Amino acid sequence: MGHRKLASPRRGSAGVRPRKRASEILPTPRSWPTIQSNEPKLLGFVGYKVGMSHIFMIDDKPTSPNYGKEIYVPVSVIETPPVIPLAIRAYVMGPKGEPTTLTEYWGDISEDLLKLIQQRKVTRLKIDKEKMKGKLDEINNKLNDILYLRVLIATQPKLVPSLGKKKPEIVEVQVGGGDIKSQLNYVLNILGKPLSVKDVFKEGQLIDIIGVTKGKGFQGVVKRYGVVELPRWHKHRKGSRKVGARGPSFSTPSYVPQPGQMGYHRRTEYNKRILKISDDPNEINPKGGFVNYGIVRNTYLIIEGSIIGAKKRPLFLRYPIRPSWIPQSAPKITYVNLYSQQG
């Protein structure tokens, strides 16, 4: 601003640029953690956001000033119907020094699920058992060259009537724990069978949540960047809800706040704690159901605090890539709010 004598701090974070719409509603992780486990397991799962509630629990974090006391905690609920592992992807080191796909082995899939998958693909998916046997032999012959294994999983939104959809989300999940041979045997045993979230995560542990935030549309700089509104005195014909100066006309610097898309961004929330995993919806459903969602009917997670995204939006749940602490067990929950959310 030309009339200022003191500098003002820059507005907005450069760490979340570009502020554009996400390319897909269910993002996949760009990196995966390494877990210390002798038993192989998937490093991620997919769930659907239900809403929020609150509970009372005994604080079990040793460094907390309320350790051992009953505390009030806002929580989020994620419904996690079983997923179906579809295929194995083996990755080896490519000629340019980057991991590349060696081959892809598909297991036995039911006809109903196969039809739903074909609706999501441009070309019709045909599974030739003879070719698949050859691909499995190729994986076994190159076990020493394989860097890691990943699994294609399909969600089952048809089990969640609140979503009003049947087409599954198909994502790739890395396998962790054990060695490559034990991982391959584990994946071959679960292909084509329903996999519960209890087979991936446990109560009390931390997870990372990857998803897309609520969309806000096209917004100005005051809401989008937190720019301070100019004083509305008798000389503000050039506007008050805008930046004082955008710089030279021939090239506007990238760090100057500009109006544009706000929300519907890909974001990752780290170290969200699973307080409870349950199969009994009666323990979480409020009277009348969750507003704008309905009634939980499948296995669900209770997550400490708020999470990103709108209700009914798919979220990717991943093992924590840098955990802040390692909970030893699940906390003791003394009360769960079941009162109606509709007043």
Curated annotation (Swiss-Prot):
Q: Which residues form a coiled coil?
A: none
| Keywords carried by this UniProt record | Ribonucleoprotein, Ribosomal protein, RNA-binding, rRNA-binding
Q: Which GO terms describe its biological process?
A: translation
Q: Has keyword rRNA-binding?
A: yes
Say if the entry is tagged with keyword Flavoprotein. no
The protein's gene is named rpl3
Say which species the protein is native to: Sulfurisphaera tokodaii (strain DSM 16993 / JCM 10545 / NBRC 100140 / 7)
Instruction: Cite the PANTHER family for this sequence.
Output: 60S RIBOSOMAL PROTEIN L3-RELATED, LARGE RIBOSOMAL SUBUNIT PROTEIN UL3
- One MF annotation (Gene Ontology) recorded for this entry: rRNA binding
Annotated region (Disordered), positions in chain? 1-31, 238-262
Assembly notes:
Part of the 50S ribosomal subunit. Forms a cluster with proteins L14 and L24e.
Q: Which residues cross the membrane?
A: none
Protein family: Belongs to the universal ribosomal protein uL3 family.
Record-given protein name: Large ribosomal subunit protein uL3
What InterPro entries does its record include? L3_arc_euk, Ribosomal_L3_dom_3_arc_sf, Ribosomal_uL3, Ribosomal_uL3_arc, Ribosomal_uL3_CS, Transl_B-barrel_sf
Stated role: One of the primary rRNA binding proteins, it binds directly near the 3'-end of the 23S rRNA, where it nucleates assembly of the 50S subunit.
| Any one Gene Ontology cellular component term annotated for this protein | cytosolic large ribosomal subunit
